[in-house]
A protein has these predicted regions:
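Structural preference for long, well-ordered alpha-helical segments in enzyme cores
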Residues: 39-40, 53-61, 91, 123, ...
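Active-site core of bacterial EAL-family cyclic-dinucleotide phosphodiesterase domains
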Residues: 1-39, 192, 219-222, 251-255
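EAL-family c-di-GMP phosphodiesterase catalytic domain
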Residues: 9, 26, 78-83, 104-117, ...
Length: 255
């Protein structure tokens, strides 16, 4: 497993991480998750992989989550986890075993999942009933963006790299502005994915200083020991954050 930090725009503190499954083969080197996850699905091994990811992520991150009650761990899910009635109870029992607050776990639902909206809505409500936070991931890549925003019960929005990249171009940036106004009006914390350049960072900071950033501009994903060193080096104090920041509509600037 590797973990990519999520950064608060206003003070550059690391407020959480996203758990990312990785495989480094001795012969073939680094294998793309798209490749080995597809193989696991074909071999009917994905259920084991799913539970391995949950258990390994929570177990590795437990010391940090226990020490910092506002630090968050994001776990990606797919169709299997949504349809598996045992997944959420298992995850809840897991965090209970480590004395972790359920709201420190962010379950990330991507718009690429092709399931009926009613099924997604039911899962979202069940996840929140266990105390987990729900993240609408990859916003802007699906075909039902607006419907998801109005029908699903979620706590965070993750803006996809495709929108972040548009900030580099004046013409495209004018189209992104109204979308950002919409997201802000929902009064939900926004995480910008795939931030890779100084320009992208500066525009986000100027217009959405209450938001969060995840991307190579700050950090790539890293193994747990490297993350430990990073947090120690930066003298991380996530306790200064009283939960996620939500936008102040009066301070909104149109990009």
């Amino acid at each position: 497993m590797e973990y990519q930090p999520v950064i608060a725009v206003n003070d550059r503190h690391i407020i959480g991480v996203e758990s990312l499954v990785r495989w480094h083969d001795s012969k073939f080197g680094r294998v793309s998750p798209e490749v080995f996850i597809a193989i696991a699905e074909k071999l009917h091994l994905y259920p084991k992989l799913s539970y391995f990811i949950a258990e390994h992520s929570v177990t590795e991150m437990a010391p940090i989550l226990q020490r910092y009650p506002t630090f968050a761990l994001g776990i990606n899910i797919d169709t299997y986890e949504i349809q598996d009635q045992k997944y959420l109870p298992y995850l809840f029992e897991l965090v209970q075993c480590y004395n972790i607050n359920p709201d420190q776990i962010k379950i990330e639902i991507t718009e690429r999942i092709s399931l009926p909206l009613t099924e997604l809505s039911d899962f979202s409500q069940r996840a929140k009933s266990f105390g987990f936070n729900v993240v609408l991931d990859d916003f802007g890549t699906g075909v039902a963006n607006l419907v998801w925003l109005t029908e699903l019960d979620f706590d965070f929005i993750k803006v996809d790299r495709i929108f972040v990249n548009a900030l580099n171009y004046d013409v495209k940036r004018k189209m992104v502005g109204p979308i950002m106004e919409l997201l802000t009006s929902l009064n939900r914390p926004v995480i910008f994915e795939g931030v890779e350049t100084q320009r992208e960072h500066d525009i986000i900071k100027q217009n959405c200083h209450w938001g969060y950033i995840q991307g190579w501009y700050f950090y790539r994903s890293m193994p747990k020991p490297e993350l430990d060193q990073l947090l120690a080096k930066q003298a991380l104090t996530p306790g200064i954050h009283n939960g996620p920041q939500t936008p102040n509509l009066a301070q909104l600037k149109v990009i």
